[in-house]
């Protein structure tokens, strides 16, 4: 049986040389939140532990300040 080629995950923030993840950068934060509002884990995104912690803090701040919704499934 042939195994499928799986793309190597890498930390986007480390590759771009980002020092601090900003809670006001909503375009970036939306890529790391699911439709149901959950923060996507680093094993799926490939984000390093340092930046995953910063990402979680930034998302929580943006939610608290009503910049990001807690969930997109409101009806």
Curated annotation (Swiss-Prot):
GO terms for biological process: translation. Keywords: Ribonucleoprotein, Ribosomal protein, RNA-binding, rRNA-binding. This is Small ribosomal subunit protein bS18. Belongs to the bacterial ribosomal protein bS18 family. GO terms for cellular component: cytosolic small ribosomal subunit. Binds as a heterodimer with protein bS6 to the central domain of the 16S rRNA, where it helps stabilize the platform of the 30S subunit. PROSITE patterns: RIBOSOMAL_S18. It comes from Pseudoalteromonas translucida (strain TAC 125). NCBIfam families: S18. The keyword Ribosomal protein applies. GO terms for molecular function: small ribosomal subunit rRNA binding; structural constituent of ribosome. Part of the 30S ribosomal subunit. Forms a tight heterodimer with protein bS6.
């Amino acid at each position: 049986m042939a195994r499928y080629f799986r793309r190597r995950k890498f930390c986007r923030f480390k590759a771009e040389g980002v020092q601090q993840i900003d809670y006001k950068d909503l375009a970036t934060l939306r890529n790391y939140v699911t439709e149901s509002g959950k923060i996507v884990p680093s094993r799926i995104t490939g984000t390093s532990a340092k930046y995953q912690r910063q990402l979680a803090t930034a998302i929580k701040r943006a939610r608290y300040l009503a910049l990001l919704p807690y969930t997109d499934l409101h009806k």
